[in-house]
Amino acid sequence: MEQPVLVIAVPRDGVAQGQNGKDHQAFESLVQTLLDFDKIPATLCFYTEGVRWLTHESPFVEELREIRARGADIVACRASMAAGGLLSDLAVGRLDSADRIDDMLIGAQHAMVV
C-alpha cells in the first residue's frame, strides 16, 4: 500500500482538555481549512479521545463526510473506539489498528498533530 503524503493525527476531542476550548477551535479550524480545497489528498487518523469526532454525536459529522468525499482517508483507531464503547457509533471513516495508524504516521512524508 502506498504511504500517504500528509497524515493528520487527531488524539483529542476538545471537550475534557481543560484548555478553554482551544482543542475544539483547533479542530474546527482544521475542518474549515480542509473544506477550502476541492481535493484533499490526506489521511486523518483519530485515536484516544479524538475518535469522538467521528461519532453520530459529533458536531462535525457532515463536514467530515464531505472531507472524505473529496478524497481524504479518515481512520479511527479500533481499540480507542472499543475502549470508549463507541464501535457502533462510528458515523464516518473506517476502523484500523493502532499499529497501522502508527505506520501511517511514521511513513508519511508530512505529519501533524492537532
Protein language model annotation of sequence segments:
Residues 1-2, 37-38, 67, 103-106:
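Solvent-exposed alpha-helices and their adjacent loops that cap or buttress functional pockets
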Residues 4, 9-48:
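Conserved mixed alpha/beta catalytic, RNA-binding, or beta-rich assembly cores of soluble enzyme
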Residues 23-29, 58-62, 94-95:
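Charged helix-capping and loop-helix junction motifs
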Residues 31, 61-65, 102:
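Short amphipathic alpha-helical segments and helix-helix/interface helices
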Residues 41, 71, 108-109:
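Short, well-ordered alpha-helix to beta-strand connector turns
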Residues 43-45, 50-60:
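N-terminal beta-loop-helix "entrance" segment that forms/cooperates
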Residues 59-86:
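A glycine-rich helix N-cap at a beta->alpha junction
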Residues 84-114:
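C-terminal structural segments of small proteins and small subunits
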